[in-house]
Amino acid sequence: MKHLPQLEGVSVGLEGEAVSLFWGEIKEEERQEIYECAKALVPWRKGPFWVGDFLIDSEWVSAKKYALLEPHFDLCNKDVADIGCNNGYYMFRMWGQKPKSLTGFDPSPLCRTQFDFINHFIQAPIRFELLGVEHLEGYGKLFDVIFCLGVLYHRSDPIQTLKSLYKGLAKGGELLLDTLMIEGEEEVALTPKDRYAKMSNVYFIPTFKALSHWLHRAGFERVEKLEIAKTGLDEQRKTEWINSQSLEDFLDPCSHDRTIEGYPAPRRIYVKAYKGA
């Protein structure tokens, strides 16, 4: 990272699917340094990013989730946090809405380094904290809007996690959350025995009704269902920018409606929860 060139005249595009960084002519050795640095930071899970003339084609086409959520939030002049922010893709997109402040929480050093790589060129006023959701309530700052995307099912105590999110919100604040879910009208959650889609850190996958009750127990005043979407191979797939398996390897080869373990295939629910004023 210390050897990345300092480029002048960098233009930033935040409106398309990719977070895009463009500049004029640079020396070939500078371009190669930038490319090799990006390649050294695999796997790139979230994105995509255009970096000059090459595309970091991440495992997840994160623009799909952002496009689904964007009609449901207004970040202008608000204090915003992204919990489990990964490499900052969503935060760079959010920056375009001119929030008052933007803070990401993620304990992964690799994610922080990827963020630093991209922000070396963008120079966005975004804070990245090497912290988890459990540090939110003691952080010393309350947020108007908190995003928590793809985190809850990795937590062994989901209600405590939701309580931490609640305590991190200012009065009248909003939580935008997505999590794996199962279909059904009962107040239940799937608890995988060992693994779900080859992941050993998936603990509880609720119905919408169970998730609503968790949020109620955490203190939220109201819960709004935004969308339910099945994860497809057009959204999560292998690319040259990851060094591991992806969704196709996690599903039953005979039926993509089930995981390799026989559980229902990944389906996500997106909700908005409100803290009382």
Swiss-Prot record:
UniProt catalytic activity: carboxy-S-adenosyl-L-methionine + 5-hydroxyuridine(34) in tRNA = 5-carboxymethoxyuridine(34) in tRNA + S-adenosyl-L-homocysteine + H(+)
Gene3D superfamilies named in the record: Vaccinia Virus protein VP39
Q: Which Pfam families match?
A: Methyltransf_9
Residue positions annotated to bind carboxy-S-adenosyl-L-methionine are: 46, 60, 65, 84, 106-108, 133-134, 153, 268
Superkingdom of origin = Bacteria
Q: Name one GO molecular function term.
A: transferase activity, transferring alkyl or aryl (other than methyl) groups
Sorted alphabetically, the Gene Ontology BP terms of this entry are: tRNA wobble uridine modification
InterPro entries xref list: CmoB (IPR010017), Mo5U34_MeTrfas-like (IPR027555), SAM-dependent_MTases_sf (IPR029063)
UniProt keywords, alphabetically: Transferase, tRNA processing
Q: What is its EC number?
A: 2.5.1.-
Q: How does it assemble?
A: Homotetramer.
What does the function comment of this entry state?
Catalyzes carboxymethyl transfer from carboxy-S-adenosyl-L-methionine (Cx-SAM) to 5-hydroxyuridine (ho5U) to form 5-carboxymethoxyuridine (cmo5U) at position 34 in tRNAs.
Q: Into which family does the record put it?
A: Belongs to the class I-like SAM-binding methyltransferase superfamily. CmoB family.
Q: Which HAMAP family match?
A: tRNA_carboxymethyltr_CmoB
| Name by which UniProt lists this protein | tRNA U34 carboxymethyltransferase
Organism for this UniProt entry: Wolinella succinogenes (strain ATCC 29543 / DSM 1740 / CCUG 13145 / JCM 31913 / LMG 7466 / NCTC 11488 / FDC 602W) (Vibrio succinogenes)
Taxonomic path: Bacteria, Pseudomonadati, Campylobacterota, Epsilonproteobacteria, Campylobacterales
Please state the gene responsible for encoding this protein.
Answer: cmoB
